[in-house]
A protein has these predicted regions:
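A conserved regulatory-domain signal marking ACT and ACT-like small-molecule sensing domains
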Residues: 1-176
Length: 176
């Protein structure tokens, strides 16, 4: 049985250890994960596999104890067989965006990509203060497929309209 876990809490040393220990205690294997710190909060998304001797109820009880002991917030969802067997998309490009922070950057870039049927696989954004004001940085991993040229042209137009720098970097399949 595969379970999707979303876990968050105040950033501190030992969160990954605490979560991994709770999962190990019920023989759950962490198969896929993404973890990051965001402005004092630590967030984790994990797909775990329970062995045949563990139940979803045991997992829920272990996670409730983890929440009580650590103050973390945990959500869990059982995955369907189709979700478990889904083959993830492999990105073929990285898109970087940088410039003055303002509302609408994420929407404009994602709107261009969605309009070309380009799938976003991963996104990371940061807004930071600098001597020039708030600066915005975004990196997206995407699957452009046959739309690389059209995507580059549309993003160049969006770059001018937004007043930000947008670069597209093709990934070689051998480094994926």
């Amino acid at each position: 049985m595969h379970i999707l876990l979303s876990i968050s809490g105040h950033e501190r040393a030992g969160i990954v250890r605490d979560v991994a220990e709770s999962l190990l205690n019920i023989h759950a294997n962490i198969e896929d994960s993404s973890m990051t710190a965001l402005r004092g909060r630590f967030t984790m998304m994990l797909i775990v596999n329970l062995d045949a001797n563990s139940s979803f109820g045991e997992l829920k009880a272990s996670l409730a104890e983890l929440e009580q002991r650590t103050g973390l917030t945990v959500q869990s969802q059982q995955l369907s067989e189709d979700e478990v067997n889904h083959v993830p998309l492999e990105p073929d490009c990285v898109i970087t965006v940088s410039g003055a922070d303002k509302p609408g950057i994420v929407h404009a870039v994602s709107d261009v990509l969605a309009g070309l049927d380009v799938s976003i696989v991963d996104v990371s954004t940061q807004s930071r203060e600098s001597e020039q004001g708030n600066m915005y940085m975004m990196a997206l991993e995407a699957v452009s497929g046959e739309h690389m040229d059209a995507m580059q042209q549309a993003l160049a137009k969006a770059s001018k309209e937004l007043g930000v720098d947008i670069q597209v970097h093709a990934l070689e399949s051998s480094i994926l």
